[in-house]
Design a protein with these regions (language model features):
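Short amphipathic alpha-helical interaction segments
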Residues: 1-11
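A short, conserved structural fragment
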Residues: 13-20
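Nucleic-acid-binding surface
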Residues: 22-172
Length: 172
């Protein structure tokens, strides 16, 4: 396609710009947000509010997709207009720690497991909404699928052992 063709499709409302060089058909059912995220960020792992909602530790559907990505990746790569995203830049060796797979809208995704998600929540608790934080902790404590040895291993690697013992140890 030539630029003039793309411009015409944009002006007529058939396509929408995601970022430079990336567009999607507005009417297409294959342009779900998660498909776009998987395409643009195949190395990213869903985390924080997105993972909390996935595991039903939060009843609030996140306004933006949260994912962890290698901190050495260019910031320009995450500068997109749609969908709304929040990239957590972390150490390269920690990106795959606690990674598992799941399905969102029939699309396979990389997502952190329950235990890693709670460690991330504890690490970022000062930046989180208090209600979401409290529900996440209560949801995890009451979850029969929690894995305490994994939680403690992740807590050690992510340096949140003290918070885990203070905030979750009381409930276990």
């Amino acid at each position: 396609l030539y630029y003039a063709d793309i411009k015409q499709l944009l002006d007529e409302g058939y396509i929408e710009r995601i970022r430079r060089g990336y567009y999607h058909w507005i009417e297409s059912c294959e342009t779900r947000e998660i498909v776009i995220i998987n395409t643009l960020f195949p190395d990213a792992v869903l985390c924080m509010e997105t993972a909390l909602f996935y595991y039903k530790y939060s009843d609030r559907n996140p306004a933006e997709w949260s994912f962890a990505i290698d901190r050495n990746v260019s910031k320009l790569r995450t500068n997109i207009e749609y969908p709304f995203i929040k990239a957590y830049r972390i150490e390269p060796e920690l990106v795959t720690l606690g990674e598992t797979t799941g399905k969102i809208d029939f699309t396979k995704v990389r997502i952190y497991d329950r235990d890693r998600t709670i460690c991330d929540v504890l690490k970022n608790m000062s930046k989180m909404d208090k209600e979401i934080f409290n529900k996440a902790i209560q949801g995890y404590v009451n979850d029969p699928k929690k894995n305490i040895p994994n939680l403690m291993m992740y807590a050690k690697k992510l340096r949140v052992q003290k918070k885990v013992k203070e905030l979750i140890g009381v409930w276990l």
